[in-house]
Amino acid sequence: MEDEAVLDRGASFLKHVCDEEEVEGHHTIYIGVHVPKSYRRRRRHKRKTGHREKKEKERISENYSDKSDVENADESSSSILKPLISPAAERIRFILGEEDDSPAPPQLFTELDELLAVDGQEMEWKETARWIKFEEKVEQGGERWSKPHVATLSLHSLFELRTCMEKGSIMLDREASSLPQLVEMIVDHQIETGLLKPDLKDKVTYTLLRKHRHQTKKSNLRSLADIGKTVSSASRMFTNPDNGSPAMTHRNLTSSSLNDISDKPEKDQLKNKFMKKLPRDAEASNVLVGEVDFLDSPFIAFVRLQQAVMLGALTEVPVPTRFLFILLGPKGKAKSYHEIGRAIATLMSDEVFHDIAYKAKDRQDLIAGIDEFLDEVIVLPPGEWDPAIRIEPPKSLPSSDKRKNMYSGGENVQMNGDTPPDGGHGGGGHADCEELQRTGRFCGGLIKDIKRKAPFFASDFYDALNIQALSAILFIYLATVTNAITFGGLLGDATDNMQGVLESFLGTAVSGAIFCLFAGQPLTILSSTGPVLVFERLLFNFSKDHNFDYLEFRLWIGLWSAFLCLILVATDASFLVQYFTRFTEEGFSSLISFIFIYDAFKKMIKLADYYPINSNFKVGYNTQFSCVCMPPDPVNISVSNDTTLAPEDLPTISSSNMYHNATFDWAFLTTKECLKYGGKLVGNNCGFVPDITLMSFILFLGTYTSSMALKKFKTSPYFPTTARKLISDFAIILPILIFCVIDALVGVDTPKLIVPSEFKPTSPNRGWFVAPFGGNPWWVYLAAAIPALLVTILIFMDQQITAVIVNRKEHKLKKGAGYHLDLFWVAILMVVCSFMALPWYVAATVISIAHIDSLKMETETSAPGEQPKFLGVREQRVTGTLVFILTGLSVFMAPILKFIPMPVLYGVFLYMGVASLNGVQFMDRLKLLLMPLKHQPDFIYLRHVPLRRVHLFTFLQVLCLALLWILKSTVAAIIFPVMILALVAVRKGMDYLFSQHDLSFLDDVIPEKDKKKKEDEKKKKKKKGSVDSDNDDSDCPYSEKVPSIKIPMDIMEQQPFLSDSKPSDRERSPTFLERHTSC
């Protein structure tokens, strides 16, 4: 039974019954078993139910997803509602469900050519529309392509197309090497089947081989001799009854119209820039429709070639043709033919019918594909919509995977937006990933991480050979340098320069480069963090108060903390990461983002305070404002007597001033020189420098807004796609360079980046190596384990939460994560930094997210009107490694870096903080608080969770975030990592406040809870006794013995049951269509 195909018992509703030869080679399909949760067409017979029946329905719906049909059940159970599947859907499931190892069908380019008169004389095939995803029409008067738009079809044209496919010639998997050979094959087949009279063969062949005029070809100039030859040949063929024998006619045909036909593409085709929109393996589908005066009935053919073939100038672009649809009909129905051509072209651009067209084995398969399309089509009332209005392509296309899975036997399919994103949960979801499975062996997780990442080590270097990597290096380098200088300066203040800017540069370079070279996730960027800075300040003050050697005490804390981290690595403790749900991730990442935004504005306010603006200045009273440099005593000092001023330090004095002033006046000195030589500034305008603050804010806001605008420039309508992509990739570097140039041109003395120019420790009281013994009592070495425990929690939480955010499913990383390997290298680097008295480093959330954003990849070729699809992230080790190497070399680049204004870098900080909040569900829910109900976006969780529950969840998240912010700003900030760990406990407590249904859309379901839920369901099944003992212990879905209910989806009248005495609707439909078709 397992090796044979199961025949469809509902096949009596089909006109065509599959025989044994037809089903041979198909895999086994159990009709009614493993039915997905929902289909689009589901009819229910409603009636009033009693209390007992309601309970029964509730019990059935509770286990609905685990049940399946059994065919030999009693009819007493027929009231149980099951998904209804039409015969067309059954046939499509049979087609698409085949286990085929062949590659996926290629992208199709569909072109619609119509037979039209050129200059009112000669008939030619003229391109009028084309499709990849959306329709583009040739504008009648403008000689240009229209904007891509959604193809709107008349329902009547689809019915006409269906009848055409029923009556016309269907030729599948034919061999042809040229267009004349293909045309001759089609015409001969029509004659053999009695659809075409033999005496019309030459006329049809001549018509099908007419020249093709494409939109790219602006003119089709030919000599008068050629025109005359063509016209005379046509007149002889169509008007002279004694045209000779068929052989002579064929020779005339060949000489007159086939000489210009070539199998090779023309120059215009090769130069067509539209090829950039198509993938390399694309194939063509040509649709030829037109009206002629020598046919009494339509000439219809649908051809699929065994191998795609280049057919010369048949197609606008030089791609091989796989499909050909021909419709020639009598005069007077040109519009109808045009609409049928648009219908088949639109069907070929539909992803489901596209696959069916490639896999169809006969006519009935193609008709079933049309029926499926009709089942899914949406009809608009004629009085409420103007078909002439072109519908803009949507920003995000609905995935066709659900439709395909529904027919290919996919499970757990939910239609109409019922499925939560990312694997059924509301968030990124990482509970089931292989990297977080506990092995139970010593260093088992670490070994698996190494084995997982080792095969990709070589590709991690050559995958970086792209211009995008250069942009990412420059962007992250500037962010890292700014971060190193900022934290280095704060560490110097907190530790009395025992750790300063130079130590920050060196530590960042060494730790970051080693981590990016050997860690499990090289996209993660290491940096100093706020909690580490707080700990360093408290530790220094504690050592100073108790007369401990600070660096030695810090060394032992680092060693103990590294030892504890290695224990966590050896015991696979990283599996606890699966309890970091979206609630914890978003709380942590949002807090860090807000810190970046807050610090950027805080530094600008501090700058404005240092260079204040004179708010009392008035233009009309500018004579009352002055600032004069006065000497230290009231006696003026003669220039000749002043021997302390160097010649280059003297102010510039004009000859007239020298003439009138025999002695030198201190008023000519600059502010800096006045203070340098002991003078004092006197006046009510001293200290006010309005230009610096104003210019700094221009640079700050200009850098931020320009970066945001250029990052979105990729989707703008300006410039070609390549230029837009290049500008978007360098969206951060370009504003930095532009505003550095503006700052230099304006000449205002804004504060600049200060980089150490000498390679030596910041403090003369320390060296580059810390001795482990001799500075503190022996018991301090053991007591250091207590603060080390706190540092371990800090390192583990910071590192792993950032790793979870980096490895989210929505980033589509293909090379896997390495949580254990990452923590291992963080521990090793902590030992190195402790011995060298360098700052400790851990994963930086915001910079890591910025690193990923700068390396995102999108489809290079996208159909007109289609938004580029996100493919993933360029996973490699080169960008991070070079960033940290450049950071170490920054000491030698001080002469160049000193020209970068600090406000520009603060603008980069603001951009990173805001950009990392994009796409965070927490921010979307915050915006909902300010939106009226009618203006709220159509988020998936708003469809399934009451709004008050959404606001309650948001309120709890805001409350936790506020508490973390307050804690961070106080002396108790040292327990900050413990409070982040408390977020997991808060999220666990939400299970008692929210249902699992609500949490599955608003957050991730905690794995343990999910397992418990499944166990409870199994216990319920055992108690009810509805499952055999064999099924209780198996993993197979629970099934009830109920009959399959199969009602055709294309019926015109809904009936509860179908009897054999009445003809099926599929048999009646051709009669109905014959009265309403042009075919």
From Swiss-Prot:
User: Which keywords does this Swiss-Prot/TrEMBL entry list?
Assistant: Cell membrane, Glycoprotein, Ion transport, Membrane, Phosphoprotein, Sodium, Sodium transport, Symport, Transmembrane, Transmembrane helix, Transport
Q: Annotated region Interaction with CA4: where?
A: 748-779
Compositional bias (Polar residues) spans?
A: 251-260
* Post-translational modification Phosphoserine, affected residues: 61, 65, 68, 223, 232-233, 245, 256-257, 262, 1026, 1029, 1034, 1044, 1069
In alphabetical order, the GO MF annotations are: monoatomic anion transmembrane transporter activity; sodium:bicarbonate symporter activity; solute:inorganic anion antiporter activity
Which residue ranges are assigned to the Extracellular compartment in the record's topology?
492-501, 543-550, 610-692, 746-779, 837, 895-901
Functional description taken from the UniProt entry: Electrogenic sodium/bicarbonate cotransporter with a Na(+):HCO3(-) stoichiometry varying from 1:2 to 1:3. May regulate bicarbonate influx/efflux at the basolateral membrane of cells and regulate intracellular pH.
Q: Where is this region: Required for basolateral targeting?
A: 1057-1059
Its placement in the membrane is given as: Multi-pass membrane protein
* Lineage per the UniProt record: Eukaryota, Metazoa, Chordata, Craniata, Vertebrata
Per the record, residues carrying Phosphotyrosine are: 30
- According to UniProt, the name of this protein is Electrogenic sodium bicarbonate cotransporter 1
